């Protein structure tokens, strides 16, 4: 994915955002820019902007995430099983398994969640606001992050769900196991996040004026004692108020408590990572008011077997649960000691 950064000049003030971007070198056509805006790929002054009619102002800092080019005709239906937790005429809440890429990209031409959604719903019954090569996708999970995510069956619902993310009214909570003992039981991490200048695969905390604001709150659920191989662990629930690429993984590394098993931001020590071959990160709960019916929807997802096995192995080393842990851990499907 390429990044474009633009500082709006005085003589451009007042132009519509889609028209302004479409006239800039390096950006696609105006209509394509409109799709990028509606898909959440454009930020103004660090905040995602979903309105193509936004009138740019002198000094605005605009960032555009350009997806890698991909032929949308490649999104063919494939009979990949979907673990659906809620479905109606407008949207789907599903649990994504580890190893499943959300949409086709270079190196992953098929076998993606998008291919599965096209098979399940039909290409004409999925939102295309994110682009025709990302049918139905409202928000993404990293390939090896498991758990709950949303898909939309039409453009209006897709826009409405993305607006819930923008207005921070889509409640998304994740479970992660991190290295070390986090001293405080709860806290908030509020930083800018931008692509790393050292490694373009990674994201990094940044004070660059074009960085996007990222807010994560966390609650420690349980701590586990240290050994000669590791510094102990903390089981944590993270609440996303924004949805930046690798946000939880970057924020946990930023406070010196990287996610266990994380190949990009972690310690890369097999013993300290409890033998995991992927980051210990699971989207366990989503809650929101249905954008069409108004019904309150809440779905929960127990930990998959590989993550649950790690916690079962660590159970004898438990230093005790917090009040939040007493509430949440029993809902994760773990074996009780």
Please annotate each region the language model reported.
Residues 1-188, 192, 197, 300-316, ...:
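RNA pseudouridine synthases
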Residues 37, 215, 240, 290-291:
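Short, acidic, Ser/Thr-enriched surface-loop or helix-capping motifs
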Residues 64-67, 198-202, 213, 265-271:
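Short Pro/Gly-enriched beta-strand edge/turn motifs at strand-loop
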Residues 76-79, 206-216, 280-281:
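Short coil-to-beta-strand transition motifs
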Residues 84, 178, 218-220, 259:
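Conserved hydrophobic positions within beta-strands
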Residues 109-121, 153-157, 166, 191, ...:
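Pseudouridine synthase
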């Amino acid at each position: 994915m390429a990044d474009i950064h633009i500082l709006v000049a005085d003589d451009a003030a007042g132009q519509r955002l889609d028209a302004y971007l479409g006239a800039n070198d390096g950006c696609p056509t105006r209509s394509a820019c409109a799709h990028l805006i509606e898909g959440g790929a454009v930020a103004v002054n660090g905040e995602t902007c979903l309105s193509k009619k936004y009138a740019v102002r002198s000094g605005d800092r605009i960032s555009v995430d350009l997806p890698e080019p991909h032929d949308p005709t490649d999104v063919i239906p494939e009979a990949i099983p979907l673990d659906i937790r809620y479905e109606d005429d407008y949207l789907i809440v599903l649990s994504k398994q580890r190893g499943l890429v959300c949409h086709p990209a270079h190196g992953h031409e098929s076998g993606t969640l998008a291919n599965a959604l096209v098979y399940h719903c039909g290409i004409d019954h999925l939102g295309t606001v994110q682009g025709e090569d990302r049918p139905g996708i409202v928000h993404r999970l990293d390939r090896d992050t498991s758990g709950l995510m949303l898909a939309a069956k039409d453009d209006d619902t897709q826009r409405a769900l993305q607006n819930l993310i923008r207005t921070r009214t889509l409640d998304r909570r994740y479970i992660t196991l991190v290295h070390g003992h986090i001293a405080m039981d709860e806290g908030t991490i509020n930083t800018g996040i931008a692509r790393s200048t050292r490694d373009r695969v990674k994201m990094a905390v940044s004070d660059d004026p074009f960085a996007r604001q990222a807010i994560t709150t966390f609650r420690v659920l349980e701590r586990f004692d240290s050994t000669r191989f590791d510094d102990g662990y903390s089981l944590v629930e993270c609440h996303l108020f924004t949805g930046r690429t690798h946000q939880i993984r970057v924020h946990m590394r930023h406070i010196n408590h990287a996610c266990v098993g994380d190949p990009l931001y972690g310690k890369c020590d097999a013993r300290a990572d409890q033998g995991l071959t992927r980051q210990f990160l699971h989207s366990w709960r989503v809650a929101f008011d249905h954008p069409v019916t108004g019904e309150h929807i809440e779905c929960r997802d127990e930990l998959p077997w590989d993550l649950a096995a790690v916690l079962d192995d660590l159970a004898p080393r438990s230093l005790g649960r917090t009040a939040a842990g007493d509430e949440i851990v029993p809902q994760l499907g773990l074996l009780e000691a």
